[in-house]
């Protein structure tokens, strides 16, 4: 049965109320509160029963047949919401807005919250170590404005990027956005890509909210930024019923203030998760995160993904690490204090979104309790933090909240004795009930002579006098007792005196619960006023925690303070890959990386498995760690400020977009060529492997030549195309290095040491032997290799096909080739067009057509 088919005139009052609410939330699954359950009806019930594996039943609703229904318990609803939201559904929570005890007729109900992928604010449904962002995306002629919000903490940021779809997708993936809001659905290809390929929730909303948040919006000068915030706030406030009153700060993210890395580099370098298993374990953040608070972990991740370019700010972090390393006693005290701090950021968020309970207030109190200690230690260390200790708030919470409160805020037992006089009086009445029962039982026994009677209580019948069957005859009319319950072996009565006391005690219990809830709400409102200050405190605590974490790492992993220079040199002595070093079962072999005196490119050759990729990643990781403010894994390091990092490491297809290894290579190479400057770092690992040998070799050489001639970025370029090693003769900024290995018969030993010069063997068969390929296969491979090498030696050099240009060719031919290559518009040439040009050049070389070019 579908809603559209229902005759609404026949619906029961309750179902009519449901339909009225559902009409306003047609795209959401409505969780409709009925007593102790959230119920779903009609299509929502069909979807929920399928997705949550619930039993589908029916409910009488005034129609000829029952309407589909399923439900979940209200006190265990979170796992069900999480499952639905992760599957891409939005859930609207419909609560009872009146107390059924005091309501005649239908209880008023309404939607109190709408939950989607980007608006989950409940800590139980969030990863402590990750932010949860939703974003508005507005397109303008020249730029795209992203407005980003973490609803769980109130962190609001805005950034503008070039109007380029690929760059937009990169930002969406880098910030790990859960949900994005577009003003229209005209860009269907982009919307489909985000939804179907990357699993991002996409919402269309064309409205803006101006007046309600006018004070905040009036602080913004840029009209486009103002539009972005008003667009996001309309969706969150009006459509999702979120309280945004605590947001009073806008973070303006300027991309040129940070070292730029695209999502490919972040993944290739395994900064946040490993490439193969997509897990945090064995990533760089896994290694560096020694934080004691969830806030600190999130801050450290932000630093890692946004390394600084301001030398003074970087050195400020170095100074703090150095100070902590020299004050180990203070550092230990600081670590112990930080360990006592809960997630103040998200606790403040819970105050605003209404999900706060008494246990949260207790966590907040305990966090505030150690702030004076943290402030004192920070001051002794010379840290420039103006930490607010929130003394008044601490005193309030300490006097009000019991040490072990319940999770529910509607069951009482939250507020301390002595906090409220009226509450204390009610509790005296309630506790006096126990004494009354004992005294009353003794008195009745004496008055009636019924020695085996008992006075008891249960929730159904209240207080009663229980008389065994053998003593029923002793109950006299003059007692004026009223029979309440007949059991097999006894009768239960209520007397006028007991009834009066019962009313007083039970009323006290109800009044206690109501008053405690009222007091809790008053306390919550006081805390709400302090949320902006709490957020500032949380930001400073997370800074301190992240710095302490980096200090711990510097000692645990033997890291050193790098020297930052304005010169265009990289000088790393005994550099190490920190993660590989920690997880390696054998002793790690450190390596130098020297790029100075006009040398900005290392052309790396060597066997597979010898450590070329690790060496390349190692340099990038040292640069990133240095610019995030961390000490680095080496004996010494002198580094410039790098503005961008581009990487192509590892051969893989882009399965989600259906692109081949070669196409992915070409796109990433083009990004580097188009975006790199002389202050950038480029890492290309075996570029060109994804296509035919000669095509790949020609492209690899052409790309390397272009970078060396036109960009002069710091470049590490590994290859198995040994012909490329001749390039150092014509390009003085290229230096050949290789990863050494020792060959002994059929055995090979990788030394993992970078040495000057090149090698002309890849030892592929030796590596296959290490992989335990069958001997028969290996022997045949060796025969084929010997045959190729023999034939190659017999050939006249003029007959060999050499894609690496022979540097002894006549000057005219060389000039023509240069002229042809220089005429290519690299930034606007597609990979296919580039291949066609190279193919044409090759054909003309073969046919001797150069005279008429």
What are the language-model segments listed below?
Residues 1-323, 336-339, 343-352, 356-442, ...:
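Charged catalytic and DNA/RNA-contacting regions of genome-maintenance
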Residues 14, 30, 446-449, 453-469:
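Extended, charged helical/alpha-beta scaffold domains that provide interaction surfaces
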Residues 42-45, 222, 292, 297-298, ...:
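ATPase nucleotide-binding head domains, primarily ABC-like/P-loop NTPase cores
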């Amino acid at each position: 049965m579908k809603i559209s088919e229902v005759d609404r005139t026949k619906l029961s009052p309750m179902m009519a109320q449901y339909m009225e609410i559902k009409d306003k939330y047609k795209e959401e699954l409505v969780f409709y509160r009925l007593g102790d359950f959230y119920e779903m009806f009609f299509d929502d019930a069909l979807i929920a029963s399928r997705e949550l594996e619930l039993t589908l039943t029916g409910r009488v609703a005034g129609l000829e047949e029952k309407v589909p229904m399923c439900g979940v318990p209200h006190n265990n609803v979170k796992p069900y919401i999480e499952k639905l939201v992760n599957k891409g559904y939005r859930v609207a929570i419909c609560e009872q807005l009146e107390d059924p005890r005091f309501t005649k007729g239908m209880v008023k109900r309404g939607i109190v919250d709408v939950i989607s992928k980007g608006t989950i604010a409940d800590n139980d449904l969030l990863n402590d170590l990750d932010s949860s962002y939703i974003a508005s995306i507005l397109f303008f002629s020249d730029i795209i404005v992203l407005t980003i919000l973490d609803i769980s903490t109130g962190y609001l940021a805005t950034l503008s990027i070039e109007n380029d779809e690929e760059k937009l997708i990169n930002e969406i993936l880098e910030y790990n956005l859960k949900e994005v809001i577009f003003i229209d659905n005209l860009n269907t290809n982009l919307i489909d890509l985000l939804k179907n390929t990357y699993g991002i929730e996409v919402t269309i909303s064309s409205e803006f909210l101006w007046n309600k948040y006018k004070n905040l919006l009036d602080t913004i000068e840029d009209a486009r930024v103002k539009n972005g915030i008003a667009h996001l706030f309309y969706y969150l406030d009006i459509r999702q019923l979120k309280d945004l009153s605590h947001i009073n700060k806008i973070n303006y993210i300027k991309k040129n203030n940070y070292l730029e890395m695209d999502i490919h580099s972040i993944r290739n370098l395994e900064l946040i998760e490993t490439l193969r298993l997509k897990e945090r374990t064995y990533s760089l953040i896994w290694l560096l995160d020694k934080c004691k608070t969830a806030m600190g972990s999130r801050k450290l991740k932000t630093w890692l993904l946004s390394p600084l370019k301001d030398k003074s700010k970087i050195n400020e972090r170095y100074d703090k690490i150095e100070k902590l390393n020299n004050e180990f006693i203070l550092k230990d005290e600081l670590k112990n204090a930080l360990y006592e701090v809960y997630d103040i950021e998200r606790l403040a968020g819970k105050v605003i979104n209404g999900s706060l309970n008494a246990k949260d207030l207790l966590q907040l109190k305990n966090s505030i309790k150690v702030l004076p200690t943290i402030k004192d230690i920070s001051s002794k260390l010379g840290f420039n933090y103006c930490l607010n200790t929130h003394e008044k708030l601490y005193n309030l919470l300490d006097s009000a909240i019991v040490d072990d409160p319940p999770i529910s805020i509607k069951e009482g037992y939250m507020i301390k004795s002595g906090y409220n006089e009226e509450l204390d009086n009610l509790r005296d009445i309630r506790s006096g009930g126990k004494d009354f029962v004992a005294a009353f039982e003794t008195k009745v026994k004496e008055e009636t002579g019924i020695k085996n009677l008992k006075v008891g209580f249960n929730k159904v019948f209240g207080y009663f006098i229980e008389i065994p069957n053998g003593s029923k005859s002793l109950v006299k009319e003059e007692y004026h007792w009223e029979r309440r319950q007949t059991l097999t072996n006894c009768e239960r009565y209520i007397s006028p005196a007991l009834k009066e006391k019962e009313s007083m005690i039970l009323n006290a219990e109800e009044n206690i619960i109501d008053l405690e809830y009222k007091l809790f709400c008053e306390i919550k409102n006081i805390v709400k006023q302090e949320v902006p200050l709490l957020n500032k405190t949380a930001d400073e605590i997370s800074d301190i925690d992240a710095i302490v974490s980096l200090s711990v790492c510097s000692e645990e992993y033997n890291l050193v303070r790098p020297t930052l220079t304005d010169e265009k040199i990289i000088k790393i002595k005994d550099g190490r890959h920190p993660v590989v070093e920690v997880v390696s079962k054998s002793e790690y072999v450190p390596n130098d990386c020297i790029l100075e005196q006009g040398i900005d490119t290392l052309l790396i050759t060597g066997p597979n498995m010898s450590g070329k990729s690790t060496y390349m990643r190692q340099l990038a990781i040292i640069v990133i760690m240095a610019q995030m403010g961390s000490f680095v894994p080496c004996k010494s390091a002198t580094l410039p400020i790098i503005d961008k990092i581009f990487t192509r490491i590892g051969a893989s297809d882009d399965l989600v977009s259906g692109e081949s290894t070669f196409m992915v290579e070409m796109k990433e190479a083009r990004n580097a060529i188009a975006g790199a400057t002389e202050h950038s770092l480029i890492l290309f690992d075996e570029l060109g492997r994804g296509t035919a040998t000669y095509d790949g070799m020609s492209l690899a050489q052409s790309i390397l030549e272009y970078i060396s001639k036109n960009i002069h970025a710091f470049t590490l370029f590994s290859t198995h195309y040994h012909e490329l090693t001749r390039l150092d003769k014509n390009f003085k900024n290229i230096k050949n290095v290789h990863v050494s290995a020792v060959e002994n018969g059929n055995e090979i030993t990788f030394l993992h040491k970078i040495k000057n010069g090149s090698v002309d063997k890849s030892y592929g068969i030796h590596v296959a032997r290490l992989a335990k390929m069958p001997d028969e296969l290996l022997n045949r491979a060796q025969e084929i290799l010997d045959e190729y090498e023999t034939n190659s030696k017999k050939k006249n050099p003029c007959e060999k096909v050499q894609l690496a240009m022979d540097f002894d060719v006549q000057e005219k031919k060389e000039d023509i080739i240069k002229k042809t290559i220089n005429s290519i518009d690299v930034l606007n040439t597609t990979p296919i067009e580039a291949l066609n040009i190279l193919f044409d050049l090759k054909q003309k070389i073969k046919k001797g057509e150069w005279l008429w070019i």
